[in-house]
């Protein structure tokens, strides 16, 4: 269009029709503004009608027929348009279009937001936090801590783009909180029926119930992460860090080991899809750290490393 208009303008001036040329320059500028203002219309309409092949193939974690995803893509087109026309130097835009460089995340660049987080769960769980104007106090059980953690993950994902990471170590202290809580319940139950099973039996009952709570808590994390939809129309991009030597003492380390074991067991099992078939979930990503206490066969936590290896062999996501 611009090349043709250059030729038209040149020919008008070549014939000495300077007044006509002046009017044509004004017309040309006006039409240029109109074209620039409507650069997103076609793409946005194709998104709404689900006929934008680029959007369908762009992100395997986003379903372009879902309303929330379409709204994110629509906002992304507006951001990309503003970024290319106003925010970036033209030479950067041209280099991107020509494939010389790739300018990442233009669909979020217009807004003042960041892309990744290392979430400080420890501070928010130990000292409380605020979510949408509601005070969330320190949880009184491991299961509640897991539920709050997923709410934090969802809030973070909805206010940034990109991934986030949490550490299971920050959940480990709440295993002891649940242990003491369950112990009081078991002791009260035994007292109510006039039975004294002895300390060993009580401890056994407590640990059995504690294991079940850990199972439910980890399951909450797994299923919340893959079923939550954030404001950017997808499940949170989350990585779970599993490092035994982050624990503050041996008691907490053993509790952390129980959480890690359950996380690996549930990942090995997978989640059921809409057909009831066990499949590999895309998230959370799991990072298991090797150290002296889990890297050799005679190490105390070698069983976790074996489980992690089996889990990797069966549930590695090719991304």
Map each language-model feature to its residues.
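Charged, amphipathic alpha-helical regulatory modules used
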Residues: 1-51
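Conserved catalytic cores of very large enzyme subunits
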Residues: 30-319
């Amino acid at each position: 269009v611009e090349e043709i208009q250059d030729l038209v303008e040149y020919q008008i001036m070549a014939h000495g029709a300077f007044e006509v040329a002046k009017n044509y320059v004004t017309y040309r500028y006006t039409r240029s503004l109109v074209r620039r203002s409507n650069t997103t219309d076609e793409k946005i309409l194709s998104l709404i009608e689900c006929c934008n092949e680029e959007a369908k193939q762009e992100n395997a974690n986003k379903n372009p027929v879902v309303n929330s995803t379409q709204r994110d893509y629509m906002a992304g087109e507006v951001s990309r348009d503003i970024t290319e026309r106003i925010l970036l130097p033209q030479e950067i835009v041209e280099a991107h279009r020509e494939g010389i460089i790739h300018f990442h995340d233009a669909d979020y660049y217009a807004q003042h937001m960041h892309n990744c987080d290392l979430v400080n769960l420890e501070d928010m769980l130990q000292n409380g936090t605020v979510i949408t104007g509601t005070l969330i106090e320190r949880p009184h059980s491991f299961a509640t801590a897991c539920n709050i953690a997923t709410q934090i993950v969802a809030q973070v994902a909805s206010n940034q783009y990109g991934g986030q990471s949490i550490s299971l170590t920050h959940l480990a202290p709440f295993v002891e909180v649940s242990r003491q809580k369950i112990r009081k319940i078991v002791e009260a139950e035994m007292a109510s029926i006039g039975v004294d099973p002895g300390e060993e039996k009580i401890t056994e009952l407590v640990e059995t119930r504690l294991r079940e709570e850990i199972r439910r808590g980890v399951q909450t994390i797994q299923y919340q992460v893959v079923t939550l939809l954030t404001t950017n129309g997808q499940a949170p991009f989350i990585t779970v860090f599993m490092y035994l030597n982050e624990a503050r003492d041996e008691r907490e380390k053993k509790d952390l080991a129980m959480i890690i074991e359950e996380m690996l067991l549930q990942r090995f099992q997978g989640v059921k899809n809409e057909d009831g078939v066990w499949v590999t979930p895309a998230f959370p990503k799991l990072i298991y750290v090797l150290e002296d206490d889990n890297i050799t066969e005679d190490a105390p936590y070698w069983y976790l490393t074996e489980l992690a290896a089996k889990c990797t062999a069966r549930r590695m996501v090719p991304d």
